[in-house]
Amino acid sequence: MEDEVVRIAKKMDKMVQKKNAAGALDLLKELKNIPMTLELLQSTRIGMSVNAIRKQSTDEEVTSLAKSLIKSWKKLLDGPSTDKDSEEKKKEPAISSQNSPEAREESSSSSHVSSRKDETNARDTYVSSFPRAPSTSDSVRLKCREMLAAALRTGDDYVAIGADEEELGSQIEEAIYQEIRNTDMKYKNRVRSRISNLKDAKNPNLRKNVLCGNIPPDLFARMTAEEMASDELKEMRKNLTKEAIREHQMAKTGGTQTDLFTCGKCKKKNCTYTQVQTRSADEPMTTFVVCNECGNRWKFC
């Protein structure tokens, strides 16, 4: 069953990428006949694919069925209500029930209210794994939330994924604030570094992982620059560290003075060289050379 849901999700994702939702209705009907579970919903992330189709499609039948599916799946995420909750709901005054959003939605002839509620339900599906961020009236914090949400909108990944970038931005900011407890320079620098890394064109996977929930907001709020770096940058840092270790080894051994090498910078022959085994034992050693005149360094195998 999981393979079937994954297959449908992949097809929908391709439709969103190609901006062609032809055949989406048939896929949605297939999903409707599949008994969905919470585990299946979380492991396949089918909700994101359905929400992306819902947002892109102009076919009323497609959007209506997508909304219906998302609404039914939302109940799985919320969990079953207890008997106590049911009893309390029965005891509520009739006037309260009539004034509730649910009652107004059922009795109202306006489709605007209904569509807004469905939109909220759909967006809630993807942030329900984490508690919603508390509201704030602090202007600095509100501005930071806006900037984080804007950074999450870099590219169009959030559309295909179906993530609520505004809520995610608020959750990230809330986690930062809860750790630092004020909006001083440390707080601003933390927010600024998150924004910079989310916008990094060379590191799109970081943004996608945050939008998909692979990196939770509270973890992302605490990540170091090294942890947020792209794979390319991590590899570069690793190589630089190795190089620094080799140079340190060369400095410790002192080296051998020679006139066999000519400095490419000052053309003098007053040099010191050291040989270090940097690769496997059956390969040639690497020779590190330092010019004693100008300090120029080079190496060769």
Curated annotation (Swiss-Prot):
Residues 76-93 have a biased composition (Basic and acidic residues). InterPro entries: TF_IIS-typ (IPR035100), TFIIS/CRSP70_N_sub (IPR003617), TFIIS/LEDGF_dom_sf (IPR035441), TFIIS_cen_dom (IPR003618), TFIIS_cen_dom_sf (IPR036575), TFIIS_N (IPR017923), TFSII (IPR006289), Znf_TFIIS (IPR001222). The modification Phosphoserine is found at S57, S81, S97, S100. Residues 76-139 are annotated as: Disordered. A zinc finger (TFIIS-type) spans 259-299. Residues 140-256 form the TFIIS central domain. GO terms for cellular component: nucleoplasm; nucleus; transcription factor TFIID complex. Its main location: nucleus. The modification N-acetylmethionine is found at M1. The gene is Tcea1. One of its GO terms (molecular function) is zinc ion binding. Interacts with EAF2. Associates with UBR5 and forms a transcription regulatory complex made of CDK9, Pol II, UBR5 and TCEA1/TFIIS. Part of TBP-based Pol II pre-initiation complex (PIC), in which Pol II core assembles with general transcription factors and other specific initiation factors including GTF2E1, GTF2E2, GTF2F1, GTF2F2, TCEA1, ERCC2, ERCC3, GTF2H2, GTF2H3, GTF2H4, GTF2H5, GTF2A1, GTF2A2, GTF2B and TBP; this large multi-subunit PIC complex mediates DNA unwinding and targets Pol II core to the transcription start site where the first phosphodiester bond forms. S-II binds to RNA-polymerase II in the absence of transcription. It comes from the Eukaryota. SUPFAM superfamilies: Conserved domain common to transcription factors TFIIS, elongin A, CRSP70 (SSF47676), Elongation factor TFIIS domain 2 (SSF46942), Zinc beta-ribbon (SSF57783). GO terms for biological process: erythrocyte differentiation; positive regulation of DNA-templated transcription; positive regulation of transcription by RNA polymerase II; transcription elongation by RNA polymerase II. It is found in: Nucleus. This is Transcription elongation factor A protein 1. There is a cross-link at K55 (Glycyl lysine isopeptide (Lys-Gly) (interchain with G-Cter in ubiquitin)). Keywords: Acetylation, DNA-binding, Isopeptide bond, Metal-binding, Nucleus, Phosphoprotein, Transcription, Transcription regulation, Ubl conjugation, Zinc, Zinc-finger. Zn(2+) binds at C263, C266, C291, C294. It holds the Pfam family TFIIS_M. Belongs to the TFS-II family. Residues 3-80 form the TFIIS N-terminal domain. Necessary for efficient RNA polymerase II transcription elongation past template-encoded arresting sites. The arresting sites in DNA have the property of trapping a certain fraction of elongating RNA polymerases that pass through, resulting in locked ternary complexes. Cleavage of the nascent transcript by S-II allows the resumption of elongation from the new 3'-terminus.
